[in-house]
Amino acid sequence: MTNALQATPKIGFVSLGCPKALVDSEQILTQLRAEGYDTAKSYDGADLVIVNTCGFIDAAVQESLDAIGEALHENGKVIVTGCLGAKKDADGDDIIQKVHPKVLAVTGPHALGEVMDAVHKHMPKPHAPFIDLVPAQGIKLTPKHFAYLKISEGCNHRCSFCIIPSMRGDLVSRPIADVMMEAENLFKAGVKELLVISQDTSAYGVDVKFRMGFWNGKPVKTHMTQLVEALGELAKQYGAWVRLHYVYPYPHVDAIIPMMAEGKILPYLDVPLQHAHPDVLKRMKRPASGEKNIERIQAWRAMCPDLTIRSTFIAGFPGETDAEFEYLLDFLKEAEIDRLGCFAYSPVEGATANDLPNAVPEEVREERRGRVMLLQEEISKKRLQAKVGKTMRVLLDEVNRNGGVARSGADAPEIDGVVYVKPPYEPHLKLKVGEFIDVKITGADAHDLWAEA
């Protein structure tokens, strides 16, 4: 047999975008491995390159187009998938094919079958699949000690600034048994922190009318509260964390807070509020826009004093008046959100918000974003300073000669702050990546904490 026949096809991979896109990439890589393909770490070593794109805002579109262009220049054989693959320009033409006509194939997001069909067409799979080489938890692109668990795909909402439903479709909830099986496999593989993600975590099960499923021989509804409770019980067996992201403030979220207070899951809630003024929320077509969010936040903190709340906001949305913006600032002063991201409104091609009157000038949008972040810096510093002197459990992400870089239950990877840990005084104590340790907080700034082991 010749070397050419023996060679294992190698696929290069570029993954862009949000954690949900990262999970799509992990699923593709897992299937590639199951079918006997190998992965390449460079363009030169790849027989073909897959680029998983993002297409939400203009900057993400440009980054994706640049990545495709680089892959074409360096390798020449490129398959494109992801959100940008489902996006059309103003004339209704495929953006990617128009800019890069030499790509081999283009698919939308969450399109494992289509991607693999394109791979098979241009790089036939090896004769002998290697399913036994694929770990039960699949191929992961995150460090071994944390992983994302996607519980659904798509979204039923039609927020005026967002085009995600046009790219990822309506809500499709995964069967609860499949979600729990993946979670168990991840914990068995050593994952210490599970980050639950979707476009709308609170809506889990709505599309299947909260159908009854089964896990470990017990009936469990396809519903957010029952899923969270089951994940919490499972995580306890492995001494692991469960963190919730993209939670809309629907009434049933109140039932999750006691679970956090009891330690079943992390007291951390990522709630994308986007604004506070009711008129702006109406223009945004936000779900749950009628909720009295200040009262909800106060009630949550009364039930769970250690609760950390993360949220995102948009400054300078079309029609936002000075009074509406000041209303937002007043809300933030009262709410004292722990972790906050603010974006100056950016028109997204295809979003209905583009047709709203009274667009806010770009310089005003940026100025308002800056004011929000300046206020948040004061709030964050105050809330972090209150933690000095306390002992808390942290998860180590990095270890170096200066000590370690860890995260507390209040810190999600990549988007929140970190805890810098000094080396232990006792020589026999060593910091290890992926392990929990208890530390005493000795200092704080507006973003991070410092601690001693």
UniProtKB/Swiss-Prot annotation:
PROSITE patterns for the chain: MTTASE_N (PS51449), MTTASE_RADICAL (PS01278), RADICAL_SAM (PS51918), TRAM (PS50926)
Start and end residues of each MTTase N-terminal domain: 9-124
Annotated catalysed reactions: L-aspartate(89)-[ribosomal protein uS12]-hydrogen + (sulfur carrier)-SH + AH2 + 2 S-adenosyl-L-methionine = 3-methylsulfanyl-L-aspartate(89)-[ribosomal protein uS12]-hydrogen + (sulfur carrier)-H + 5'-deoxyadenosine + L-methionine + A + S-adenosyl-L-homocysteine + 2 H(+)
Gene Ontology CC: cytosol
Cofactor: [4Fe-4S] cluster
CDD domains: Radical_SAM
GO molecular function: 4 iron, 4 sulfur cluster binding; aspartic acid methylthiotransferase activity; metal ion binding; protein methylthiotransferase activity
Subcellular location: Cytoplasm
Iron keyword on record: yes
The record's free-text note on cofactor binding: Binds 2 [4Fe-4S] clusters. One cluster is coordinated with 3 cysteines and an exchangeable S-adenosyl-L-methionine.
Binding site for [4Fe-4S] cluster 1: C18, C54, C83
Function noted in UniProt: Catalyzes the methylthiolation of an aspartic acid residue of ribosomal protein uS12.
Name recorded for this polypeptide: Ribosomal protein uS12 methylthiotransferase RimO
Species of origin: Janthinobacterium sp. (strain Marseille) (Minibacterium massiliensis)
Lineage, broadest ranks: Bacteria, Pseudomonadati, Pseudomonadota, Betaproteobacteria, Burkholderiales
